[in-house]
């Protein structure tokens, strides 16, 4: 509706101009690809959720994360030296988590995850591939939300399907297929369950805490534990009072059935469910590599590679126009009115967002207190 459209434009105004332009531009490019697919009668390019776009997005993800790790190689080497007590380590006195704790905690956590996978019947190479794709998505999502300014993103590709197809149908046993399908639904399909972007934003905010920044990690852990207990209680209470069958079809009904259906296809028809698209995968990787090289080599380059990562999916279909309008308003003010007017416009759009979410939050609280009898927005 009109109110939501205005709020989306306000959000897009706050996004860096090169990101908002990239989201709009690459969304239009994806629609051109879809038109080419229809004109050439290629079914895998004919719809927004076609296999071509899924594998192209995966290729872009792999290239983006590879470039990100390459650019951070010196910093990561300094973190490793610091964690191992070697000379030349990077100073972590202003970080919310010490580098030794972060590094060894990461190592122990990865080991525990791999051990859990193997214990429940997943082959070790497959477990490494599953965890690698999970972290690939986490890193991309964190960058899209915290650096790019986008508040949501959707990955099109299916994690167990990718591993199953690239392995020729030999990666998963029965238990491994079920585990991967369930985690693919929970960690890839449910964007609101991901903590990587929220954690990164919290770490950025911690810079204002000074010496107390190290209290952020225990505060985050306590917050997550409390949220898990509260939301688990709330979901179970609603399930037993209203009936779980009355829940939303998409999240509570369709997605669980889809997860078990994917696992069933891998188990019962391993050969028929193998469907790799190496060409689309390569196109996405090459395209993202070129974009990152242009971004790093040309100071004036106006398009951020993050736009390519976030230009497909359900939300992109509804955000492309607000992002274009937000970019147009921002660039127009910068060109015609100057920085002072731009700052005033920024405050105006922030006020719109705060007012919208404050009213929505108040209505939500009143609905909760009245058992849903208070009218919603």
Task: Mark where each language-model region is.
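Alpha-helical multipass membrane-protein architecture
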Residues: 1-377
């Amino acid at each position: 509706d009109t109110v939501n459209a205005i709020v989306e434009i306000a959000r897009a105004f706050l996004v860096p101009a090169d990101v908002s332009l990239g989201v709009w531009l690459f969304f239009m490019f994806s629609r051109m690809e879809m038109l080419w697919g229809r004109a050439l009668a290629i079914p895998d390019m004919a719809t927004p959720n076609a296999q071509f776009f899924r594998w192209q997005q995966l290729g872009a993800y792999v290239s983006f994360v590879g470039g990100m790790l390459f650019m951070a190689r010196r910093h990561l080497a300094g973190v490793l030296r610091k964690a191992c007590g070697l000379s030349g380590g990077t100073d972590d006195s202003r970080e919310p988590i010490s580098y030794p704790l972060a590094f060894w905690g990461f190592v122990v956590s990865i080991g525990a995850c791999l051990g859990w996978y193997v214990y429940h019947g997943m082959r070790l190479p497959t477990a490494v591939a599953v965890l690698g794709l999970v972290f690939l998505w986490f890193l991309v999502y964190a960058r899209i939300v915290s650096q790019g300014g986008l508040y949501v993103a959707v990955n099109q590709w299916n994690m167990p399907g990718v591993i199953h197809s690239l392995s020729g149908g030999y990666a998963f046993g029965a238990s491994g297929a079920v585990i991967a399908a369930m985690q693919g639904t929970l960690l890839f399909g449910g964007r609101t369950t991901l903590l990587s972007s929220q954690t990164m934003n919290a770490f950025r905010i911690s810079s204002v805490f000074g010496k107390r920044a190290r209290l952020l990690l225990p505060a985050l852990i306590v917050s997550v534990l409390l949220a898990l207990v509260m939301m688990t209680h709330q979901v179970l209470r609603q399930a037993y009072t209203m009936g779980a069958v009355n829940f939303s079809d998409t999240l509570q009904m369709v997605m669980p059935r889809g997860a078990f259906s994917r696992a069933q296809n891998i188990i019962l028809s391993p050969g028929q469910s193998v469907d790799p698209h190496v060409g689309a995968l390569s196109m996405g990787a090459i395209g993202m590599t070129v974009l990152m090289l242009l971004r790093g080599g040309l100071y004036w380059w106006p398009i951020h590679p993050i736009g390519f990562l976030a230009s497909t999916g359900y939300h992109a279909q509804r955000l492309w126009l607000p992002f274009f309008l937000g970019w147009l308003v921002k660039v127009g003010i910068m060109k015609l009115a100057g920085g002072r007017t731009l700052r005033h416009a920024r405050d105006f759009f922030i006020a719109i967002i705060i007012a919208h979410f404050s009213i929505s939050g108040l209505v939500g609280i009143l609905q909760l207190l009245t058992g849903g009898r208070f009218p919603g927005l």
